[in-house]
């Protein structure tokens, strides 16, 4: 694991692990991610980080919240395609199918530390830059 990746994962895991826990059954968070076949984009590096960080989060509710929230942009708001040989990434940044440069960049920022080992993620980010 690369240093930046490890630092980001460790910081996030510590933050979530130290947060107050709740054991109330009615507060349980279910997996809200779309089925794999219905996700807009899947990154092997993101999925691996979710597994690693989830092991460090003791509170089940916080663990499931992380598992649902961290990949949400890739799961639901990214539209990726190739225009010829050029990648093209559209990121829905609101309640309508519109893309704002600042917002779309901010939505993909948490995944930048994972790019080095994930060619598909690199191509997705290149598509955003091309936009």
Model-derived features with residue positions:
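Low-complexity, Ser/Thr/Pro/Gly-enriched N-terminal "stalk/linker" regions
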Residues: 26-99
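Bacterial N-terminal signal peptides that target proteins for export
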Residues: 1-10
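Generic structural signal for hydrophobic core residues of well-folded globular domains
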Residues: 15, 73, 111-115
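Bacterial N-terminal signal peptides
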Residues: 9-19
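Membrane helical hairpin/interfacial module
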Residues: 89, 93-131
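Sec/Tat signal peptide C-region and signal peptidase I cleavage site
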Residues: 21-24
């Amino acid at each position: 694991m690369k240093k930046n990746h490890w630092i980001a994962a460790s910081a996030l895991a510590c933050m979530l692990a130290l947060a107050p826990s709740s054991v109330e059954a009615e507060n349980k968070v279910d997996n809200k991610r779309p089925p794999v076949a219905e996700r807009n984009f899947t990154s092997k590096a993101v999925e691996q980080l979710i597994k690693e960080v989830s092991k460090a989060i003791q509170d089940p509710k916080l663990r499931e919240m992380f598992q649902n929230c961290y990949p949400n942009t890739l799961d639901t708001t990214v539209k990726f395609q190739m225009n010829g040989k050029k990648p093209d990434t559209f990121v829905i940044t609101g309640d309508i199918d519109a893309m704002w440069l600042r917002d779309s960049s901010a939505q993909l920022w948490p995944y930048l530390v994972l790019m080095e080992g994930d060619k598909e993620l690199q191509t997705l980010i290149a598509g955003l830059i091309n936009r």
